[in-house]
Amino acid sequence: MDVNPTLLFLKVPAQNAISTTFPYTGDPPYSHGTGTGYTMDTVNRTHQYSEKGKWTTNTETGAPQLNPIDGPLPEDNEPSGYAQTDCVLEAMAFLEESHPGIFENSCLETMEVVQQTRVDRLTQGRQTYDWTLNRNQPAATALANTIEVFRSNGLTANESGRLIDFLKDVMESMDKEEMEITTHFQRKRRVRDNMTKKMVTQRTIGKKKQRVNKRSYLIRALTLNTMTKDAERGKLKRRAIATPGMQIRGFVYFVETLARSICEKLEQSGLPVGGNEKKAKLANVVRKMMTNSQDTELSFTITGDNTKWNENQNPRMFLAMITYITKNQPEWFRNVLSIAPIMFSNKMARLGKGYMFESKSMKLRTQIPAEMLASIDLKYFNESTRKKIEKIRPLLIDGTASLSPGMMMGMFNMLSTVLGVSILNLGQKRYTKTTYWWDGLQSSDDFALIVNAPNHEGIQAGVDRFYRTCKLVGINMSKKKSYINRTGTFEFTSFFYRYGFVANFSMELPSFGVSGINESADMSIGVTVIKNNMINNDLGPATAQMALQLFIKDYRYTYRCHRGDTQIQTRRSFELKKLWEQTRSKAGLLVSDGGPNLYNIRNLHIPEVCLKWELMDEDYQGRLCNPLNPFVSHKEIESVNNAVVMPAHGPAKSMEYDAVATTHSWIPKRNRSILNTSQRGILEDEQMYQKCCNLFEKFFPSSSYRRPVGISSMVEAMVSRARIDARIDFESGRIKKEEFAEIMKICSTIEELRRQK
């Protein structure tokens, strides 16, 4: 979608134009090939930042580990990970002193969550490292595989469906001398294709049992798989991100629940809120500093940037924080929460796919898997790769690298925010005991620092003190990348503040346009995005009207549904013209059927079908909203659907839009090519899982959805629910006697089959 940039500048104050300098139009860069190099960079850098720490060897896995905690105090400005335990604990104590009862209350809230969370919480989330197959899988499949393996190894606590019981199994699994797992393998054979008479390779999937000893199992359980982060704008170099396995995820979830609960109570925390709520929270802190800096005081703000936040954090520090936060709590609770940081202190980073070599002269390509990097002759690699491999070799075990210091990206966002806020908290006058004082905002690794003092020397002293205090807990403020301004102008988490937050509209640009789900959803999402931007992002009426016209144009080109009376020829125009001519009320045709656009900025909240319903010919209504229409594989749609929109910053957001089911709400069929690959068995498992969940949710509409607890299985729950519903429907006259009898018969048959099984 082309937007003429000059139109944007007609009446825009200069500071609002900041957003046009963002690299957010066009396609974002994606990574290709292997992430092995990026992962080695991360591992090597992390060790370099902590190089003066103490080396030890893990007695269970034999992995060499570097511990920088309480290491030497830094003498220069280089980033370092030498956090001092007593400093972290003191910062926690002061945080508690200024917020009485905060840790206590958060622990109570978390304890309640721990006792109620079901294990299916772990099915949320995208790709997950599946330790049974040693590669990434969708979260639900990885969880199912893990539970299946646990069950076949005699671990059954998780049958009750509580997450805490699954975690008990995880702990027990680590004590077992060996584990038996099922892995997939593929056989290839050449067969003649009946149709084309050519030879083709046919792949079949087998499952085989394999025994894993304690050491190998522990390595897998502690492994984080790595991938390259895609679609990152404004960077030349790609970087690696990690995805943990199922053993770690549950423990991390509880730690983050506790930290989230603390963050919600801290006014300086930019997490877990977002959007307008976050802006209001931030504006409060700024207002406080500006009103308190009376005429006698200066107030400056640093737009802060930290050097390699994750790689200088340390799981051992997080353990110290948790130990402090949960003091006086029951032993079991403290144990559950301390496991995540302990596992992270012993984590292993999987190096990914390895390297691809090709010989131009011989037209040969070969994959060097990560497992071989420990032993292969380095003469095949270029200079920089050779250096990386040499450096990482002492750390390698079975294609994974021991990575004790550092936290991989995105694992403990909430807890690290608590650490950051605890340093901001130390800026109160009662702690600094001088004329300067500070406050600020923290959101994961991003921060803004507001310093007040009677003169410039005081400001400088305040900044220096903040900088040095951060160093003591392993936070490295970058002097090169942070900049200071009079309070009133700064940037924080891509929000630009200039006497109030300026809408950074360019961030939303990627979400304008046609999503490509289907005609019905795309129309609805398109107008909802425009509506939301009018509400939240200062999208003015004239620009919104222009955006709407561009969207409709874009939509018509995408689905080739130009108006019935247009001159444009496409492969759909013949059908659409015919429909146009035989329709009495042409205004009633949907845009996707060649109708006119009736949207303007006043009615964006109404789904198109509803907007045009009164204008439609009766037979058109009948065809459009007919669930028995044989040409449509129909998808049942609740009144509200969720679309994934891509804002420019951060992860894809989920956005609600109104969904009215019509014959345009089709679902494209799955690409067949996956059916011939090694993923096929997994795909079938996944579909089975999906079908069961969908069926279950049909019986328990979300309003009355208490998951069955205790011994009853999903099937029993559904059968008993069906009987209750049928009786109510029969007694109220909604179903006939024969239908009631048939339902009862089916229920009995199902129970009979279960008994025979």
Swiss-Prot record:
Signal peptide residues on this chain, from the entry's feature table: none
Bias type Polar residues, positions: 55-64
Parts forming coiled coils: none
Motif (Nuclear localization signal): 187-195, 203-216
GO biological process per UniProt: DNA-templated transcription; symbiont-mediated suppression of host gene expression; symbiont-mediated suppression of host mRNA transcription via inhibition of RNA polymerase II activity; viral RNA genome replication; viral transcription
Modifications the protein undergoes after translation, according to the UniProt entry: Phosphorylated by host PRKCA.
One annotated GO molecular function: RNA-directed RNA polymerase activity
Pfam families in alphabetical order: Flu_PB1
Catalytic activity, reaction form: RNA(n) + a ribonucleoside 5'-triphosphate = RNA(n+1) + diphosphate
Record-level GO cellular component terms: host cell cytoplasm; host cell nucleus
Enzyme class: transferase
Compartment(s) where it occurs, according to its Swiss-Prot or TrEMBL record: Host nucleus; Host cytoplasm
Membrane-crossing segments per the record: none
Keywords annotated in UniProt: Eukaryotic host gene expression shutoff by virus, Eukaryotic host transcription shutoff by virus, Host cytoplasm, Host gene expression shutoff by virus, Host nucleus, Host-virus interaction, Inhibition of host RNA polymerase II by virus, Nucleotide-binding, Nucleotidyltransferase, Phosphoprotein, RNA-directed RNA polymerase, Transferase, Viral RNA replication, Viral transcription
EC number(s) given by UniProt: 2.7.7.48
Segments of this protein annotated with the region Promoter-binding site: 249-256
InterPro entries per record: RNA-dir_pol_NSvirus, RNA_pol_PB1_influenza
Entry superkingdom: Viruses
Function, in words: RNA-dependent RNA polymerase which is responsible for replication and transcription of virus RNA segments. The transcription of viral mRNAs occurs by a unique mechanism called cap-snatching. 5' methylated caps of cellular mRNAs are cleaved after 10-13 nucleotides by PA. In turn, these short capped RNAs are used as primers by PB1 for transcription of viral mRNAs. During virus replication, PB1 initiates RNA synthesis and copy vRNA into complementary RNA (cRNA) which in turn serves as a template for the production of more vRNAs.
Summary of subunit composition and partner proteins: Influenza RNA polymerase is composed of three subunits: PB1, PB2 and PA. Interacts (via N-terminus) with PA (via C-terminus). Interacts (via C-terminus) with PB2 (via N-terminus); this interaction is essential for transcription initiation.
Family that this chain belongs to: Belongs to the influenza viruses polymerase PB1 family.
Protein name as it appears in the record: RNA-directed RNA polymerase catalytic subunit
Organism: Influenza A virus (strain A/Hong Kong/1/1968 H3N2)
Gene from which the chain derives: PB1
